[in-house]
Regions:
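Hydrophobic/aromatic-enriched cytosolic interaction surfaces used to assemble or bind macromolecules
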Residues: 1-259
Length: 259
């Protein structure tokens, strides 16, 4: 705990993961907390040793994995209108908006978090910056463009949701979040994106990153529908001190790759 110089907080609808890093960017510890009710969140923040002992002295980034987000081209973005952009895709009552730049400042992702939830985090974590969780997926996938085919779907799995990106001729043409609970959900949403992009299902490539068990999807079922499918792990750029690397067993993007 004494070596902690930075915190990454991965905040899902029913899960909080705390990654503590030292001054060299090495992950020194990971705490994973499932929860059901929001009042449990405050108890988690109170008892976590990394947060309770170091959160007032180090930088912390809260990655919010929620349906409340939208992408805006930088040339059209006005920071004073962030809530307006977000309101096009979700209701913003009782929500605070935030934003961050992506793709060498060509894109801006606007996210939202409940005011009451943000107040809980702010109570226990100083120097808190906010980013939408999908920003990690987009940044990673844009870096993979040179390796992509002319028609490619990329899927990042995060708990009970997926981010699906569609690339045509190595350019991002589609990106959105979907809640997936079974094979039927996955096929429904992926087929919808394929149709929207006019992709040939028999020839386009689909790349999946993450743990299929988190969305209750079976590889053998998907291979009946996708002939060019690859399940992959990112090339590791996230480094660990001995003992902390077990986080990679989650197969999460954040366990392998650091932006």
């Amino acid at each position: 705990v004494s070596n902690t110089s930075g915190l990454s907080l991965l905040f899902y609808p029913q899960r909080l993961i705390v990654l503590a890093k030292n001054q060299n960017g090495l992950v020194i510890g990971v705490n994973d907390y499932p929860f059901v009710e929001k009042n449990e969140l405050e108890m988690i923040l109170q008892k976590d040793l990394f947060i309770s002992q170091k959160a007032s002295h180090c930088e912390a980034t809260l990655y919010v994995y929620s349906p409340d987000f939208c992408l805006v081209p930088s040339v059209l973005f006005d920071a004073s209108e962030a809530e307006t952009y977000l309101n096009f895709s979700t209701k913003t009552d009782g929500t605070d908006s935030f934003y961050s730049s992506l793709n060498e400042d060509q894109l801006v992702i606007v996210g939202g978090i409940e005011k009451a939830t943000l107040a809980i985090f702010s109570k226990y974590v100083n120097n808190l910056s906010l980013k939408h969780g999908s920003s990690l997926a987009i940044t990673y996938l844009l870096g993979e463009k040179p390796l992509m085919l002319n028609q490619e779907l990329a899927v990042i799995i995060e708990d009970n949701e997926v981010y699906i990106a569609g690339f045509t001729n190595k350019e991002l043409k589609f990106f959105n979040r979907f809640e997936v609970r079974n094979n039927q959900d996955f096929l429904k949403y992926s087929f919808s994106v394929l149709h929207q992009l006019a992709f040939d299902r028999m020839h386009c490539k689909i790349t999946l990153c993450g743990n299929l068990e988190e969305i209750n999807v079976q590889e053998q079922v998907l291979r009946k529908y996708f002939k060019n499918m690859e399940i992959t792990s990112p090339k590791p750029t996230q480094n660990y001190l001995p003992g902390a690397e077990s986080f990679r067993e989650t197969k999460k993007l954040e366990a392998f790759w650091a932006s």
